């Protein structure tokens, strides 16, 4: 029995583990032992005082335990619930226009270039490498309208070991850049091909997601057909909603027969318990209630909302309505690919709402940490698999070293009281970057540093 149990154990760590639960936004577990099976599952997380008991049960020796230094800690992998992979080509630039003008001047012309699979291969390889290196273990990607390029994105995410949803964008309306759209029939047919080929690949951690860009770029026929495809294959759906005021007015003008923006998606089979909608800055009480009833999720993208002067999402109000919510970078409307940036911006936006007396309190850093990990996993329907270090979940994790070479963080004697203090964790969340993320694990497999095969 001992030999059989031993074969199941692949990794054993001893040190500090920081994660969230639904009752505690940030739990710091000092001097704990965590074991990972060869299938990548967490099989135990207990105080180190239980080492002898665990060693007997799992048949390991003390020399097989990897001991973290007193300033290192593990945290769950970050979950980016909304990112446009092709827009990484111009991330960090061109955030000088409001949403609709920005789409027409920068985004659509850039995405049109992805009809070239060579362009797709270069940009998608770089964005997956960059996001993984910055701790994004799970990403919900928009591709472009090009099926073959979107399939390349899925292939690359699988090759690098990132957990992901990948969507082929659908749009049969685009009067301003007419060369970047499909016919309704093409969009439906190509989405079916994309889904079929993705499912045939049977990737272990990369799944297709139905992706109507937003109501302004999709006819009712297309939206309804996409809803049917999602239902037939039991797939997740992603899109945008209520990002800025001009967009909302345009939706009212295009679809006057609906009660509101949410109703457009709801009546066309696109608002389900497998839907994640980006932004939602201006959703009404009625709309939030519908989101809650349907079980749909929101991806909060604070960098993009600020950079394009779109709006300020009231996360506390969303949570009050019991709507699932995670964080997104929204590259490239959000100029940063880092989920640490999303954490910081989410705190700042909440502080602004407090300053303006919209709310009587603001989100804490700990609460936003939960949004970026466990909250994001719930928004994408993965909270039974990832999001924290509960036994039975996959080991998606980041090894954080605040004292890494050339670290942007300075630590002082007062930051340590025996073991790592919460001040060190806060310093990483506010000041840290990829230099502090020494190792990245997805499903128990170390994916950063990168292997020579990718």
UniProtKB/Swiss-Prot annotation:
The protein's required cofactors: Zn(2+)
Modified residues (Phosphoserine): 453
Class of enzymatic activity (EC top level): hydrolase
EC number: 3.5.4.3
Cofactor binding summary note: Binds 1 zinc ion per subunit.
Binding, Zn(2+): 82, 84, 240, 330
Record GO terms (molecular function): guanine deaminase activity; zinc ion binding
Binding-site residues for substrate, renumbered to this chain: 84-87, 213-214, 240-243, 330
Free-text function comment from the UniProt entry: Catalyzes the hydrolytic deamination of guanine, producing xanthine and ammonia.
Family that this chain belongs to: Belongs to the metallo-dependent hydrolases superfamily. ATZ/TRZ family.
Designated name of the protein: Guanine deaminase
Source organism: Rattus norvegicus
